[in-house]
Amino acid sequence: MSKRIYNFNPGPAALPLSVLEEIQATFLDFAGTGMSITEVSHRSKPFDAIINDAVTRVKRLLGIGDDFKVLFVQGGASMQFAMVPMNLLPDGKSADYVNTGTWSTKAIKETKILGKTVNVAASSEDRNFAYIPKELSLDPNAAYVHITSNNTIKGTQWADFPDTKGVPIVSDMSSDILSRPLDMSKFGLIYAGAQKNIGPAGVCMVIVKNDLLEKANTGLPSMLAYKTYADSNSLYNTPPCFTIYAIDLVLKWLEETIGGLEKMDAVNREKAALLYDLFDASSFYNGTADADSRSLMNVTFRLPSEDLEKRFVEEATKNDLGGLKGHRSVGGCRASIYNAMSMEGIQALVDFMKEFERTNG
Amino acid sequence: MSKRIYNFNPGPAALPLSVLEEIQATFLDFAGTGMSITEVSHRSKPFDAIINDAVTRVKRLLGIGDDFKVLFVQGGASMQFAMVPMNLLPDGKSADYVNTGTWSTKAIKETKILGKTVNVAASSEDRNFAYIPKELSLDPNAAYVHITSNNTIKGTQWADFPDTKGVPIVSDMSSDILSRPLDMSKFGLIYAGAQKNIGPAGVCMVIVKNDLLEKANTGLPSMLAYKTYADSNSLYNTPPCFTIYAIDLVLKWLEETIGGLEKMDAVNREKAALLYDLFDASSFYNGTADADSRSLMNVTFRLPSEDLEKRFVEEATKNDLGGLKGHRSVGGCRASIYNAMSMEGIQALVDFMKEFERTNG
Ligand SMILES: Cc1ncc(COP(=O)(O)O)c(C=O)c1O
Ligand SMILES: Cc1ncc(COP(=O)(O)O)c(C=O)c1O
Ligand SMILES: [Mg+2]
Ligand SMILES: [Mg+2]
Ligand SMILES: [Mg+2]
Ligand SMILES: [Mg+2]
């Protein structure tokens, strides 16, 4: 038997055990090919079946049709900070960015490096990004409105998306992709590094509306143009086959074991509530995000002192509860509870937290 | 028992069985962490140990010191076609490119997309790239000389590298990286998509000399600047952890099981000779590359008719010899025999080829 911990890492993060077991079982001989999935050609029928299945599952989960393309792009979400404006922000136009934390700040920085014009439509920097801004000063002529739907480090999440009066929303959903249903009619493009909710690190999923693709900027290097990926089903060059295979298995788990995004959302709400209720009932644990901006994915909290926080993380680790340290830029504690974190994991954490408060409070 | 075939795919390609077995055995619990390697944080001690080990092994294998950086970059070799000139070709300078096939042609195309100046120093296009050019018209002021060391599709390889009078060579070594010793003093940068000689698809290894890094172009998006990777040990953002782990195991195999690049080279020469000797002794099988330009990695050949080639590939497949079809752009047959292809695999192929000639010749 392998030892398994409850893994609260922010990403790379826990994956469903059944997915890991299937990868392991088939690792030397994938689908009767006599090859590992790491050895199969990306120009083969077995791999075509995988990538097509993944695309179909994403579309079905999100309820989108042929007006969107689902792309697999390397370079992580960080590469998208540059690719989004390269492709979607034409010269002479500007884009609105809402600054809700570290990742939004980086998205803005990369856009400016390209010499493009950014309008910061709102920011919550005044209170260390502890909330999602309510008032946005949007430019009706903006090429797009960029939003970080879930702020992994600050522990905040957009509960609803704003009405942008027809300007397409571009959203970094790295830390909450496929964790809840979405009204996709509001979005022009969403992107997400795989390594939190949908698979191992090594690919970024980009879902883009055809009309944006059609008017995208031209003259880009092939690997930096969305069109290259859209025209080739992400097979212009060798894709990260193993990672896409693992993602396909996670998507299958999401559809067939969980039962889709409504069900996933309900479970995620229940999981997060167990922790937030504990904070609200205790003076020992305190959440860092405003109540109306709390993330269902990254639950950030503080203990009465940094010493206690250090001991908390250490003792949790000894109890096989891993990854609870807050991001180095903010300190404190953080429990990342993405789709694959089970209710049992949350329950184990809650039990540990109560015991730790009893003995240290 | 898993079924295993002899896999002659051009990439993704065969990996050493012992590497696959180790990944499989540790897949649910990596190094006692209680997590899969796909779930381990890239900011953790266990992952640091992996990436540092990989870098150290590459340097030891190639006999290079701290004057080079070993980087892991996403996007495959195709992304390097653009990143090389973005970083290393300053405005007002030009670069020399030797055109030896499909991949060189693409490298040239991407450089031109960027509006940069290319001098084609030589080309073997006149005879469908069946040879490596001997005469190069090099520009002493070029920023670099770009060479595709092994032409995966055309089956040709540079046996030696030219004297470029101090101008650094930049080489796409996707299909022969770490297959033989190199005199690294000639090179400013080498790059290789992992999926042929060193691991699964999903990362490109870039080995670059510090002096080129120091004078590299600035003002690039973070993910497109080599400096970003060099300054962060390839951990600026989330790297493809699983792929880097697999590469580290392949490097360990290369050092500890094979015994380094001299040994690997000797084995590779022996393997290729078995096939080329067969061609030379037979009028049924004929190599497509000039004798002095033959690749030790991708052995391209023709049979007397396309019908026979089709039957050859089909019957080979039935005999568990996979991936022998030539690239769709050239036809014919191709046996890709990278580092991980065993002598037993070559012997099985040679036996099959003799039998096929006997019954169809
Ligand atoms: C919201 C968000 N955006 C972007 C990133 C950067 O992702 P990557 O490491 O894939 O570039 C992260 C990583 O944690 C994130 O949480
Ligand atoms: C020599 C060479 N260069 C570049 C490439 C493209 O590599 P990638 O698919 O990693 O972009 C290949 C792929 O076969 C290749 O053989
Ligand atoms: Mg954040
Ligand atoms: Mg409280
Ligand atoms: Mg070629
Ligand atoms: Mg012959």
Curated annotation (Swiss-Prot), chains A, B:
Tell me the InterPro entries matching this sequence. Aminotrans_V_dom, Pser_aminoTfrase, PyrdxlP-dep_Trfase, PyrdxlP-dep_Trfase_major, PyrdxlP-dep_Trfase_small
- What EC number(s) would the UniProt record show? 2.6.1.52
User: Where in this chain does the entry annotate a coiled-coil region?
Assistant: none
**Disulfides per UniProt:** none
Functional pathway: Amino-acid biosynthesis; L-serine biosynthesis; L-serine from 3-phospho-D-glycerate: step 2/3; Cofactor biosynthesis; pyridoxine 5'-phosphate biosynthesis; pyridoxine 5'-phosphate from D-erythrose 4-phosphate: step 3/5
Cofactor: bound how, per the entry note? Binds 1 pyridoxal phosphate per subunit.
Where is L-glutamate annotated to bind?
A: 43
Instruction: Mention one GO biological process in which this protein takes part, according to its record.
Output: L-serine biosynthetic process
- Reactions performed catalytically: O-phospho-L-serine + 2-oxoglutarate = 3-phosphooxypyruvate + L-glutamate; 4-(phosphooxy)-L-threonine + 2-oxoglutarate = (R)-3-hydroxy-2-oxo-4-phosphooxybutanoate + L-glutamate
Gene3D superfamilies linked = Aspartate Aminotransferase, domain 1, Type I PLP-dependent aspartate aminotransferase-like (Major domain)
Biological role stated in the UniProt entry = Catalyzes the reversible conversion of 3-phosphohydroxypyruvate to phosphoserine and of 3-hydroxy-2-oxo-4-phosphonooxybutanoate to phosphohydroxythreonine.
Please give the subunit comment from the record.
Homodimer.
Protein name as it appears in the record: Phosphoserine aminotransferase
Organism per entry: Desulfosudis oleivorans (strain DSM 6200 / JCM 39069 / Hxd3) (Desulfococcus oleovorans)
